[in-house]
Amino acid sequence: MLDMTERQVESVLIEIPKGSRNKYEYDKEKKVIKFDRMLFSSMVYPCDYGFFPDTLALDGDPLDALVLTWEPTFPGCVIDVHPVALLDMKDDKGRDEKILCVPETDPLWNYIETLEQVPPHLLKEIVHFFETYKNLEGKHVIVIGWEGLDAAVDMLREAKSRYLEKNK
């Protein structure tokens, strides 16, 4: 269980800014952010999207992060965040968890500590985006649901351990 007197602050590397239809991905070999594709639908990312460096998720990639921002940042931006919740999902490759975070230095969001403090409609928008954004590609995503702070912290801890184990 996380000690709420000390927030867990982590860094996230942003790949895709809020409001973008462009899908960017970090190329591990070239160490650059590359344009992957334009989303096939007219949907846009509901929040900044990136990953936690030096982690390894169950899908073999770094652990995904969703960062609530008032204004979009940019690909390659690093933001200090604290985790709030876990979005549990499955795609064609299997489990695809994402950690919902808020920027540590943004007074519009940094008061949020738990899933229950996130605007409920925003949570619905995020779920709706991930349930439908790949439909026109003929791919489908199953959103299992939201889990709280403890699940997010546990997933982050496991992803860090998995990364360290793989890179001994």
Swiss-Prot record:
Q: Where located?
A: Cytoplasm
The catalysed reaction is: diphosphate + H2O = 2 phosphate + H(+)
Q: Does the keyword rRNA processing apply?
A: no
For Mg(2+) 1, which residues are the binding ones? D59, D64, D96
Lineage of producing organism: Archaea, Methanobacteriati, Methanobacteriota, Stenosarchaea group, Methanomicrobia
SUPFAM superfamilies membership: Inorganic pyrophosphatase
Q: Which GO terms describe its biological process?
A: phosphate-containing compound metabolic process
**Per the UniProt entry, what species is this protein from, by scientific name?**
Methanosarcina acetivorans (strain ATCC 35395 / DSM 2834 / JCM 12185 / C2A)
Signal peptide positions on this chain: none
Q: What is its EC number?
A: 3.6.1.1
What positions does the entry give for Mg(2+) 2 binding?
D64
CC terms in the record's Gene Ontology section: cytoplasm
**Lineage top rank: taxon:** Archaea
Q: Can you state the subunit structure given in the record?
A: Homohexamer.
What protein am I looking at? Inorganic pyrophosphatase
Give UniProt keywords alphabetically. Cytoplasm, Hydrolase, Magnesium, Metal-binding
